C-alpha cells in the first residue's frame, strides 16, 4: 500500500502536482485513436451514428471516472481498482484485475515502441536506421523517463498531453473556418450531414441496421478512451489527491465532449462518410489518410501530413510512457497487497519501484523480440490483451457499487466523503451494462449475422479466459469468498495530507 510519508524508503513519493494529474487525465482521453481511426467511425455509422456512439461511451467513461474518483479520493493508492476490488469485493478479483491490467500494459508498451518506429520511418532520412533500432531507442527513452522520480514522468506526460491538446484546439478552429469557407476557398456548411443516407447509416436503410452500425462504433470509441483510468493509479503519488483527483474527474466529461464529439462533428461536416479516405490510417505509412491530415491539407496547410505524423509519434510515446508507469505501479502495489512477490515493492530513494520497473521492462523487451521473430505468436499475444481495458472498467464499476453499499451498511455518513460520485447507483450500473455490451459485441459478425468463426472468436475473446484463469487460480488456492458488506475493509491506511 502506498504511503504519504516521503521518509519511508519502501514507499513511492507523493510528488505529482495537480497540473500533472489534470493533464494526464486529458492525455488519457486523446491519442492515436482520435487522430488515426476516428474517420472509420464516421464511415461505418455515419456522422450521426459516430457522434451518438462517442457520446454514449463518453457518458460511460464519465460514470466510471466518477466512481474511480470517489474511491481514489477516499483511498489514494497506486493499486487503484485492483486494491479496491481486493478490499471491497473479493481478493481474487483484485488479484485477477491487477495481473490482467499489468499484462495489458506490458503488451501495449511493446506494441507502442514498434509503432513509434513506423512513425519515424515516415520521414525518409530516418530510414537510415532499421525499425528494430528505433524501437529499442524509444524503449530505452521510456525506461529512462520512468527510472527517475515521478516528477519526471509527470512533467513528460504534461508536455506530451499539451501538444495533443494544442493540436486538437487548432484542428477545431481550422475546421470551423473551413466549414464556413474562410479557409480552403469553398463554403461547405452542413451538406455532408445529409449526403447519401446520412446522418445515420447501416448495411441498409432500416432502423435496426443503423442501430447495429452505431453499436459497432461503440468498440472503436471504447478503445479510444482506454487509459482514462490512469487517474486512479496516479492518486497513489499525488501531492493532494483529495483536491487533484476530483478536479481531474470533474473535467473528464467536458474534455470528452470538446475533444472527441466536436472533433467527430467537424470531420463529419468536412468529409462525407462515403469518402474512401475515412477508411483510416492504420499505420504511419498511411498518415495522409488521417482525417486530421485531410482537414489540415484541404485548408491549405502543405506540411499537414508531416506535422500530424510528429503529433502521432508523441501520442505513441506518451502511451508507451504511461503504460510503463501504470504497469510498474500496479506490480508494485500488488506486492504491497501480497498479490505479488514482496521483492517487487522495493523502491529507490526517489520513490521509483525499481524491481517492478526492471521486471516489467524485461518482459516488454521479450514481447518485442517475439514480435520480431514470430508474427503469429505476437498476434495472439496482442489479441489476449484486447479486452483487458474493458475488464478493468467492469472492475471499477463493481468495486464502487460494493464500496458505497458497504459504506452505508457500516453506518458511515456519506457527507464525510471528500468526493462523492453523482448518480449512484445508476451511474455504475449503466457503466457496467455498457461495458458488457462492448465486450460481447467485439465479434460483430457473430452478433449481427450469427456467423461463427471459431478462430476469430478465440482470438477476439481470448482475454476473458485468461482473466478467469487468474481469478480461479487465486480463488482455488486461497479459498477466498465474496466479502460481506459489514466485513469490508473501509480503513484509510494511506496517510493523505
PLM regions and their residue ranges:
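Membrane-interface "cap" regions at the ends of multi-pass membrane proteins
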Residues: 1-39, 43-48, 62-66, 78, ...
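Hydrophobic transmembrane alpha-helices that form the core helical bundles
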Residues: 40, 53, 62-147, 152, ...
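Junctions where cytoplasmic loops transition into the N-terminal start of transmembrane alpha-helices
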Residues: 49, 160-163, 230-268, 330, ...
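Selective recognition of specific alpha-helical transmembrane segments in multi-pass small-molecule
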Residues: 56-63, 164-178, 246-277, 357-358, ...
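TM-loop-TM module centered on a large, flexible mid-protein loop between adjacent transmembrane helices
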Residues: 83, 122-126, 197-205, 213, ...
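Membrane-interface loop-to-helix entry segments
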Residues: 132-194, 226, 249-253, 257, ...
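C-terminal membrane-solvent junction of multi-pass transporters and transport-like membrane proteins
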Residues: 160, 343-352, 393-459, 494-496
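Hydrophobic alpha-helical segments and their helix-loop junctions in multi-pass secondary transporters
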Residues: 163-200, 267-274, 393-410, 437-445, ...
